[in-house]
Structures are given as C-alpha cells and as structure tokens.
Amino acid sequence: MLTIKVASANPAKINAVASAFAEIFPTETLDVKGIAVPSGVADQPMSSDETLLGAMNRVAELARVEADFRVAIEAGLDGDFTFAWMVIEHQGKMGKARSASLMLPPAALSQLQQGKELGDVMDAMFNQDNIKQKGGAIALLTQHKLSRSSVYHQALILAMIPFLNPDLF
C-alpha cells in the first residue's frame, strides 16, 4: 500500500492527487489523505515565486507525517493568469510542475489586487458557493469543460517525472 499525504483539506486537490496517483500506480492500493497545513504565504499568492514557496512550505510541514509521498498544490496568480504549483516529495527528492494557466477577467483581477481570494471573487461573480472546493475558477471560466481537479491531474503527473525516471534525476 502506498500512503500519500496531501497538504490540504480541499476535496478538489485531494481528488486530483488520488486520480493522478491511481493512473501512475494502477495496481497499487492507495491511501490518500489530506491534512490542512499552513503555506506561510498570503492566502492569495500574487506571483509564481510566492506560489511555489507556498507549495514548498506545505510539503515541508508534512515532513513530520509518515508517508510514501507528500504532495502540495498551491494556486496563485502570475500577472493576468491563475495557475498552481505542484510539489511532490518522495524519499527526500522533489518533483515540481506548474499547471496550465488561465486568463482571469479584468473585474476579477481588480478584486484580487484589492486583497480578495480568487474563490470568493468567483463565487460572487458566478453566484456560486465555495467553488474552490468544487470545479474552481477553471470550471466556471471553461463552462465546465475542465475542472480544477482535471487540470491539476495532468500537472501532478508531470511533477512525478523524477520518480518515474529515477536514473535521470
């Protein structure tokens, strides 16, 4: 059995991790659990560097927890775009990948620059409740063609590259 700890209690993130690891390890029994840990950065990171730091900090917070893999997903902004960093730790090695980016409407960006969080802004713009734990801004802006979990799934597999090719890393 592989134990995977996710540095979040957000179901969208936990489901993305479970889905990606099930694809990578189709014959393994997986125990995927989320644990809320602090990021050490702003609730709404405003740059790629700050977002990556938040993911790295979350994985570091999980170091005290027994697991085969420790995973953090930190969403943030980079200019007019939102995206997320994936950081995976396994036996002291790190894998990282950045998700696809999506443009945000100018009305949303102006509210984010005033200190609001993207999930709250999207809830208000689209008359939703807690979208960040469902399909996310991605689902709303793609008219549900993609979801937060589906976009994170791909990036998580990319973050696993060092572990899938250990002789190269």
Question: Could you describe each region identified by the protein language model?
Answer:
Residues 1-67:
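N-terminal polybasic phosphate/anion-binding patch
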Residues 43-169:
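Anionic-ligand binding patches
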